[in-house]
């Protein structure tokens, strides 16, 4: 939901334009992106490759469930671009940090990484403090005394639930995603087309 200009340095309209720009840059930098130099263009349905079709299916899958969005590298990148316009990218960054943390096998690395994540996202006045309740924060602090791969599970679940309930629906309703989904739908319907999609309007 848009807040007052006193709360944010940019208006809702400017934030929407910023998301489109970020998403366009994301597409352009993607390995699947157009090499024309135009931001927001994409080779959706090249007859010489299945990559365009696969990407369009990926895009359409993002609205099926939050799990599918988070399991897609492109989806995470697009969602992160959107969250930056809402000044809430720390939620996704924390979730991703927890996912990487769980992959660690060294007890020494677990301990040091756990403290870095706590200092960056969990403790009061953290530079990227996420919105969790006091009880969850203190539980996580206690877990750090003997850090394991699951010591952030409670906090990660709370943040994920917040994103799924709050940010994810707004992402799906955003003009930029709807434009992208429209292009993806058209590409899926015409897989043999080699014409680039229309650029996102900014």
Curated annotation (Swiss-Prot):
<feature type="lipid moiety-binding region" description="S-palmitoyl cysteine">
    <location>
        <position position="12"/>
    </location>
</feature>
<keyword id="KW-0734">Signal transduction inhibitor</keyword>
<comment type="subunit">
    <text>Interacts with GNAI1 and GNAQ. Interacts with GNAI3, GNAI3 and GNAO1.</text>
</comment>
<keyword id="KW-0597">Phosphoprotein</keyword>
<keyword id="KW-0472">Membrane</keyword>
<dbReference type="InterPro" id="IPR044926">
    <property type="entry name" value="RGS_subdomain_2"/>
</dbReference>
<feature type="region of interest" description="Disordered">
    <location>
        <begin position="183"/>
        <end position="202"/>
    </location>
</feature>
<dbReference type="InterPro" id="IPR036305">
    <property type="entry name" value="RGS_sf"/>
</dbReference>
<keyword id="KW-0564">Palmitate</keyword>
<keyword id="KW-0449">Lipoprotein</keyword>
<dbReference type="InterPro" id="IPR016137">
    <property type="entry name" value="RGS"/>
</dbReference>
<dbReference type="Pfam" id="PF00615">
    <property type="entry name" value="RGS"/>
</dbReference>
<dbReference type="GO" id="GO:0007186">
    <property type="term" value="P:G protein-coupled receptor signaling pathway"/>
</dbReference>
<feature type="modified residue" description="Phosphotyrosine">
    <location>
        <position position="177"/>
    </location>
</feature>
<dbReference type="GO" id="GO:0016020">
    <property type="term" value="C:membrane"/>
</dbReference>
<dbReference type="InterPro" id="IPR024066">
    <property type="entry name" value="RGS_subdom1/3"/>
</dbReference>
<keyword id="KW-0343">GTPase activation</keyword>
<dbReference type="GO" id="GO:0009968">
    <property type="term" value="P:negative regulation of signal transduction"/>
</dbReference>
<dbReference type="GO" id="GO:0005737">
    <property type="term" value="C:cytoplasm"/>
</dbReference>
<dbReference type="GO" id="GO:0005096">
    <property type="term" value="F:GTPase activator activity"/>
</dbReference>
<feature type="modified residue" description="Phosphotyrosine; by EGFR">
    <location>
        <position position="168"/>
    </location>
</feature>
<feature type="domain" description="RGS">
    <location>
        <begin position="65"/>
        <end position="181"/>
    </location>
</feature>
<feature type="lipid moiety-binding region" description="S-palmitoyl cysteine">
    <location>
        <position position="2"/>
    </location>
</feature>
<protein>
    <recommendedName>
        <fullName>Regulator of G-protein signaling 16</fullName>
    </recommendedName>
</protein>
<comment type="function">
    <text>Regulates G protein-coupled receptor signaling cascades. Inhibits signal transduction by increasing the GTPase activity of G protein alpha subunits, thereby driving them into their inactive GDP-bound form. Plays an important role in the phototransduction cascade by regulating the lifetime and effective concentration of activated transducin alpha. May regulate extra and intracellular mitogenic signals.</text>
</comment>
<dbReference type="GO" id="GO:0043547">
    <property type="term" value="P:positive regulation of GTPase activity"/>
</dbReference>
